[in-house]
Amino acid sequence: MSRNIDFSAFQLKVIAIIAMSLDHSALLFLSDGSWRYECLRFVGRLTLPLMCFFLVEGFFHSRNHQKYLGRLLFFGVIAQPFYSWMIAFDQIDSADLRFFLQTGNVLFTLALALLALMIRASRLSVPLKITLIFALSFAALYCDWGIYPVIFTLVLAHYYPERKAQTIAYLLAAMGLLLLADRQIFAVMPSLVLHIMPAGILLPPLFWHFYHGKKGARFGGRYAFYLFYPVHIALLCSAKMFLQ
């Protein structure tokens, strides 16, 4: 079956941005806890792990990690006002910068994850590497998705390029994070049945299993996916403001 399905990097990125758009649409337009809200946000959990997967791919294929990091930070700065608008839609005050600084968007989280990969690959001593990565993980708590991207990228990088090992390690890490994030650790299954959204992070391996390194189309160029992030948030927030 895997020989008949061959996702390109472009196709997987399109899947990721569709999932992200559905996730943010649910966040802005649907009632928290409704079945439609849970289903759309369940699908939305595809996006971050796929981003981490391609972050690792890019890390091992990029000759200039500093430029890669700069690109994430640059577009993160551009996206931040729109992200802050979305997460504090009913409260934001244009004269108040608290919401701008409250939570960093996912591009900042991915930048921290990339820094963790750079530290891991450096010639620093092991104790210093651990200390710095721990500090990055703490900083990630103030960004979208928290420590998830840092952990996911480190796990995927450790087993790169062995896809099966990557998948097994990722699933173990994801299930461990789900257990830790659940308030009732010993009643996790009933909780996940009632709130299926978090379990969506277990789905991405079904997609990257069928990726074999093909880049695919280059529609919009290298920066299209970076630009889509703030643009789609701006459009969704504008639509919500218009409907109100």
UniProtKB/Swiss-Prot annotation:
Protein's name according to its UniProt entry: Probable fimbrial assembly protein FimC, serogroup H1
Cross-referenced InterPro entries: TraX
Any Pfam family matching the protein: TraX
The organism of origin for this protein: Dichelobacter nodosus (Bacteroides nodosus)
Keyword field: Fimbrium biogenesis
